[in-house]
Regions:
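Short, compositionally biased P/S/T/A/G/V-rich stretches that sit at domain boundaries
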Residues: 1-4
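Structural beta-strand segments of beta-rich domains
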Residues: 7-13
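Exposed beta-strand face motif in extracellular beta-rich ectodomains
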Residues: 9, 22, 64-68, 217
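Solvent-exposed loop/turn segments flanking beta-strands in beta-repeat/beta-sandwich domains
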Residues: 13-38
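Surface-exposed, short loops/turns at beta-strand junctions within beta-sandwich domains
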Residues: 49-51, 58-65
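N-terminal "domain-start" segment
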Residues: 75-195, 255
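Acidic, glycine-rich flexible loop segments
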Residues: 176-236, 254
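Short, low-complexity, Pro/Ser/Thr/Gly-rich segments in the mature regions of secreted, periplasmic
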Residues: 240-255
């Protein structure tokens, strides 16, 4: 495990073979499955029956976890392989791609950055009040990011205890957002804190948010689709053919 924000790691590898070492190689490996990948250039070495070998393998420019497979072949042709997984300690937490709605229909309109990004309906969100960071809704027909604590001001369904959150549109492009790595929070931390309790949203834009408890991050709007459904109002009535938006987002949050 690397130090927080570190983008390099040196693995100290020591191998022994009673029958003598013939070949030593290091391969890339899949960080999730551990499956063996391509041979890393310059790591293949052959020996004349020596029984021990030590190498320091330097990994630099790390922006995500890194897995390697060390392969040793002895003089009798026996191959022994072991994986080494280097886990970075991120400065920025990435979410998965999720669907969120401007009204509670199928996915929900409340978002929490924990657990790689979670979306909740009002019906199941009350048990996660401390985790909910922002919400979405329709304000005067405009799909918007809305401070969870301010939903009642816009006549939107809500529940008690939700936190206050501020928003701002950034000048970042989606490409610039995608280029923010897990080991460098500076592109987020240096942005001026947001001040708006709600803001209309558009596809392919990047928004800044900061919660009352200090969590600061970015929201990238990948796509927006207009839909209709039977939607509950703030007074508990259900209205057919109500227009709302289904929005695809990811978030990147300072750890």
């Amino acid at each position: 495990v690397t130090a927080k924000g570190a983008d390099n790691y040196t693995a100290k590898i020591r191998v022994q073979a009673t029958n003598g070492i013939s070949y030593f190689e290091i391969y890339n490996a899949d960080i999730k499955t551990g499956a063996k990948g391509s041979l890393i250039e310059g790591t293949g070495k052959s020996f004349d029956s020596q029984t021990e070998y030590t190498e320091e393998f330097h990994m630099t420019g790390l922006t995500d976890n890194k897995c390697i497979r060390v392969s040793v072949t002895d003089t009798e042709g026996t191959v022994i392989e072991r994986n080494l997984l280097v886990k970075i300690t991120p400065s920025v937490l990435f979410s998965e791609t999720v669907n969120i709605e401007t009204a509670d229909d199928y996915y929900g309109s409340y978002y929490a950055t924990w657990l790689n990004g979670r979306v909740y309906l009002r019906s199941n969100g009350e048990q996660y009040v401390p985790e909910i960071d922002f919400s979405m809704g329709m304000i005067d027909g405009i799909p918007s990011l809305i401070s969870p604590a301010q939903r009642s001001q816009y006549n939107l369904p809500t529940f008690d205890g939700l936190k206050d959150t501020k928003f701002e549109l950034t000048t970042l492009t989606i490409t610039e957002y995608n280029n923010i790595s897990k080991v460098n929070a500076e592109p987020i931390s240096t942005l001026t804190d947001p001040t708006l309790s709600n803001i209309g949203i558009s596809a392919n834009k990047v928004y800044l948010f900061k919660t009352a408890d200090g969590k600061k991050g970015l929201i990238a709007i990948t796509s927006m689709t207009k839909r209709t459904g039977t939607i509950e109002t703030a007074n508990g009535e259900w209205v057919k053919d109500t227009e709302y938006y289904r929005v695809v987002i990811t978030t990147k949050v300072i750890a």
